[in-house]
């Protein structure tokens, strides 16, 4: 999908785990089917997941992103009642894979694209509670920007207005 995409497989993840985390050697590794294009996710045994960045250009940037995501997950875990993936190890580049990667707690459940939660009142309440919890986290001077992820809300006004107008029959 991406020009700089790094190929990954369950065999590669097994080799990385065996070399870097011998305590998890022998655990079964299987790819998690996901629509994501930024990370590949592999189930490791019953309690872990390996997340491998798929964009191969910048190992230092990948490490910063993984460390930042782990810090954000810790902060999020304290702000809501909902479980979040907890990073338990940070892997290093290895033979066949040029980037740092993460091992985190496996969270059981299903992704939102597996079911249509549109008519679920409990889901809507949970989502509202989660968003309120996230909004209550103090930004502490941090700036959030990025294409489609954060930034100045007024820059997204036209797109959101279009989405809301086209969703009138659903809302």
List each language-model region with its residue ranges.
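Juxta-kinase regulatory segment immediately upstream of eukaryotic protein kinase catalytic domains
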Residues: 1-23
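ATP-binding pocket architecture of kinase catalytic cores
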Residues: 2-3, 26-170
């Amino acid at each position: 999908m991406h020009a700089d995409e790094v190929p990954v497989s369950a065999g590669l993840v097994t080799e990385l785990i065996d070399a870097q985390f011998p305590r998890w050697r022998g655990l079964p590794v299987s790819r998690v089917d996901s629509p994501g294009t930024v990370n590949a996710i592999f189930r490791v045994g019953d309690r872990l997941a390996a997340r491998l960045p798929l964009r191969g250009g910048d190992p230092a940037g990948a490490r910063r992103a993984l460390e930042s995501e782990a810090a954000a997950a810790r902060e999020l875990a304290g702000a809501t009642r909902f479980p979040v993936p907890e990073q338990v190890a940070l892997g290093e580049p290895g033979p066949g894979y040029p980037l740092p990667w993460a091992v985190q707690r496996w969270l059981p459940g299903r992704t939102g694209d597996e079911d249509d939660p549109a008519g679920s009142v409990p889901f809507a309440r949970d989502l509202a509670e989660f968003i309120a919890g996230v909004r209550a986290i103090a930004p502490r001077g941090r700036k959030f920007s990025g294409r489609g992820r954060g930034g100045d809300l007024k820059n997204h006004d036209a797109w959101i207005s279009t989405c809301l107008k086209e969703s009138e029959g659903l809302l």
